[in-house]
Amino acid sequence: MEQSNIDLEGALRALCQRARTAARALAPLDRAQKDRALRAIAERLRAEAGEGKRSAVLAANAEDVAAARAAGVSEALVDRLVLDEARLAAIAGAVLEIAAASDPVGQVVGMERRPNGLLVGQVRVPLGVIAMIYESRPNVTVDAAVLCLKSGNAAILRGGKEAARSNAALGELISDALRSVGLPADAVQMVPSLDREATRILLGLTGMIDLAIPRGGEGLIRFVAENARVPVIQHYKGVNHLYADAGCDLEMACRLVENGKLQRPGVCNALECLLVHEDVAAPLLGRVAALSERGLELRGDAATCALVPSARKAAEDDYGREFLAPILAVRVVRSLDEAIEHIGRYGSMHTEVICTPRYDHAQRFLREVDASCVLVNASSRFNDGGELGLGAEIGISTTKLHAYGPMGLASLTTLKWIAYGEGQTR
C-alpha cells in the first residue's frame, strides 16, 4: 500500500474510533438531551436562512452551484444541489419535526412470561456508527445527522464533491450546535477526503462501521456494493411505474402522471414509466400527450407511437432508465399480468403505482409487485418519509435487510433481547 493510502487509512481509523467513542456517549442519552441538540441545530439553520447573503451556508452553496453549472452538470442535478432561504428554513422545520417525534430507543417489544418464569422480550437500541455515502443533495447532510443523533447513533458523512463546500459549512454548523449543548462534536463527522479511495477504505473498516448507507446514482451504489466489507443498505435508483388499468378514471390517471413526472423530475420517487391498458390507451395517451406543453417528452413502443405521433420510439434500455428529467417511457399492455411482468423485469423495487377502479386488481397488484412502496390510485411522490408519517428519512431502502422503503428513526435501531429472572438456571 502506498504511503499516502497508509496515511489516509490511519486518518479514517482515527475518525471511526472517535465516532465509536461518541456513539457510546450517545447511546444512554434520554430523549430530552437528544432533542435539545436537534433544536440547537434547527435554531442555527433558521438563523442562517435569515442571514440571506451573509449566510456562510448559502455562500458556500452558491460556490458549489456555480462550479456545478460551469462543469455542465444537468439542471435536474443542480436543482438537488441548490439551497436558498426557503429550503434552509424547510430543513430546519424538518429537524424540529424529528425532535417532536417519539424516540424509538428503549422501546420494549413483545415481553412475555416463559413457562420457567423468565420474562423475556426485546428492546430497541442504536446500531452504533453509521456511515452515510451520498451525492449532490446537501439537505441529506442534515437529515442523516439528526436522524442518527435522535436514534442514538454516531454519523460519518461522505457527501459528493459537487456539494463539498455546502456540506463542510453544514457540518461545522452541526458540530457547533452539539458543542453548545454539551454533546461530543465527534457524534457527526465529515470524511475529510473526497477521494474515492477514502470511501473504499472506509467501507473496509469492519468492526468500526456498523452500517453503511449509500444514497445516489447507479455508479455510486455499484461502487459501494463491490467494495463494502461492512453491512450495507442500498438506496437504489427509482425506476417507478404507473399502470393505468382498464376502466380507470382517465382524469385521475393523467393527474397522477403529471404529479409523478413533472412536479420534481429529478427526485428518486418521480415516475419514469407509464404502462397503459390497451382499452384506455387512446383516450389516456391523448391527455398525457398534451403535457408536452409543460415540456414532457414521451418515448413509447410501436402502439404508443401510433397513437401519439409526437412520441419518440423507445429504445430497449429506456424501460429500465431513471431519467431524472421530464422524459417518460410508455408501453401499451394487454393485461394486468403483462404490466406486472414488465415491472418485475424493469423495476428497481422502489415505488410502483396502479390506477384502477377494481378492488381485486388493486389487491393483486399490492400482493405481487415487489417494491418498497406500492400505491393504489395515488402519486408515486408519496413514497417519502414525511408523507408516510416518518418525518425526515435517511433514505429509501431498496434492499430488504433490515429495512425496506423509507428509513426513519426506527430503521436506525436494532432489537436486543432482554430477560428478567429470579435465579433460574437451565
UniProtKB/Swiss-Prot annotation:
It is an enzyme of class 1 (oxidoreductase). GO terms for molecular function: glutamate-5-semialdehyde dehydrogenase activity; NADP binding. It comes from the Bacteria. It is found in: Cytoplasm. Keywords: Amino-acid biosynthesis, Cytoplasm, NADP, Oxidoreductase, Proline biosynthesis. It catalyses: L-glutamate 5-semialdehyde + phosphate + NADP(+) = L-glutamyl 5-phosphate + NADPH + H(+). Its EC number is 1.2.1.41. Gene3D superfamilies: Aldehyde Dehydrogenase, Chain A, domain 1, Aldehyde Dehydrogenase, Chain A, domain 2. Its main location: cytoplasm. Pathway: Amino-acid biosynthesis; L-proline biosynthesis; L-glutamate 5-semialdehyde from L-glutamate: step 2/2. GO terms for cellular component: cytoplasm. One of its GO terms (biological process) is L-proline biosynthetic process. Catalyzes the NADPH-dependent reduction of L-glutamate 5-phosphate into L-glutamate 5-semialdehyde and phosphate. The product spontaneously undergoes cyclization to form 1-pyrroline-5-carboxylate. Belongs to the gamma-glutamyl phosphate reductase family. This is Gamma-glutamyl phosphate reductase.
